[in-house]
Structure formats: structure tokens, C-alpha cells
Amino acid sequence: MSAVASILSIILFLAFLTSGIQKVLFNPLASQSAGHLGFSKSAFQRIGMVEIAGAVAVMAGLAAKGTSFWAILNELAAGGLTVTMILAVYFHVRKGDDVKVFAPAAGLAVLALLELIFRLA
């Protein structure tokens, strides 16, 4: 795995762990976002749990190589986080949100995809 993939894994871990914790704890910003996007509290908290699990899985496979369980887990997590953020962008666009509202999700989707690409290269 390249140094770029390692750095991206660490960035993804920190970003998704932070985001997921905020959703699980349902802080005021998460509450506002959930309501705006049409998600219930429990659904938004489950999204947060998925983000935390993805963050941990990306980090768990950080040093793994080849076709080991941990390497595959990292790749699946990066792919899953990419899809999660693409769906986040979709829900924001569907609500007519401005680009600045969904830019962080779009950026994380790109970073997760890049991590996967560099991981597989």
C-alpha cells in the first residue's frame, strides 16, 4: 500500500469517526440535518454507526497487504464509505441544497474513492 493510501486512510478514519459520533449522539447539528433530510432520529443514528464502523474498518486494514482479511476489509470499507457519501450528496441535491451544504460529503466521497484506488494500485 502506498503512503498516499495510508494518509487517506487516516484522514478517512478521523473524518468518519467524528461525523459518526455526532450522528449517534444526535447533537443539535445532526438533529437539524436529520430533520431537513427527512430522516428519523434512529435512522440518522444508524447512519452514524455505519460511518463509525467504516472508519474503524478502514483503520484496521491500514497496514494489511495483499488479499488478507484486513486488506479486503479496508477495501470494502472504503467502497462502502464512498457509496454512503454519494447517497448523502443525492439526498442534499434532492432537497435543493446549495453546493456548500453537500460539498463536505462530496469531498469525503472523493477521498474514500481515492483511498480505494491507491489501495488497489
Show the residue positions of the predicted features.
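Membrane-interface extramembranous regions
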Residues: 1-121
